[in-house]
Amino acid sequence: MIPLRILAPGAALACATALAVPQDAGAPPAGDAAPAVAKAKSFDATVADAIAKGVAYLRATQEQDGSFGAPRNVMFNESFATLHTYEAWTYATTGLGAMALAECGTTAADEVALDKAVDGLLQRPLPKRVSEWDTDNVWAYVYGVQAFARLLPLERFAKDPRRPAMAARATELIAALERWQTPFGGWAYYDTDATTIPPVWTTSFTTAAAVIGLLDAEKAGLKVDPRMLNKALACVAHARLPTGAFTYNVSAVSSPEHLEFIDQVKGSLGRIQVGNVALVRGGLLDAKVVKPGLEQFFEHHRFLAVARKKPIPHESWYAVAAYFFLFGHYYASEAIELLPTDQRAPFAKQLQQKLLEIQEDDGAFWDFHISEYTRAYGTAFAVLALQRTRRATASH
């Protein structure tokens, strides 16, 4: 909606004077503004339709127990996974699905699906460490915490009888993150080097995603140990390079290494946004870094695009893995919301266009095949990103 503005007397006089002056021959006819407005509204309607189709897909593919994703249609690239790996992925994907339904759903059927997802998050056992080297359980904690942190402040849950259980489960998830925080101060999803308790291997992007979830939890009134959060923020800050890229691994010395490595800007596109959002929201970076980070994202976007749907992780240029595509776009939408209002629309439009180009006929979005989790987490990431960009353009 375009806000109506009341003109001051002086402005009204100037406006009247301007109307009396003959129109410049080189200027477009005044009527040309109407098609431009109509075109903008039409594009926004297209985005809204894409969101609705994505939400309908999530609703149609939700499991009977309210969860999203399942170990069906397994491919060779997940031959390592065990039952507990799938339990962790299910919990994380259900958290994302719940957020998508809560933020993007518009119908009574969406409300029913959201209630089922919340029940699924409450009734499922808390995922435990998968094995000595597989710590995919961390993803369950990250998106479980964020889901409850986003749901609890909503009016529809203010008097919900499940509210105490939701807060209790969120507290459990926060405690689990604290238990599995590495000596570097962050988190990852494997521990291939030391296989210790707590794990040692740490990634910048898992840590940044966890930080954002914890900041959301604080905002929702949940208790978060400031020492844990500060260590995690310092960990993400340590991984940030002068180029604006974030190293994949967190190590003693952060370095971009060789010119075609994953820690160059072109290999870091899916990590830059989540890292910047975490550090800006956590108060360790000035918000002025957000715009250059988004400019890098779109300037080099082809390196994310060419990696999408490749079946082997990191087989693409700059070792980009396919699963960074929708992850990166989701956090890019959060980065856009950190920009000054008058700078958001151009980036929002670009992000919308990139996502609209890849939506499947059934409404799903996907980037990397992981059983039935692929389209569930991908669609949740995409509709959440599109919804945020609509907010950004509406505010503009």
PLM regions and their residue ranges:
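N-terminal secretory signal peptides that target proteins for export/translocation
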Residues: 1-3
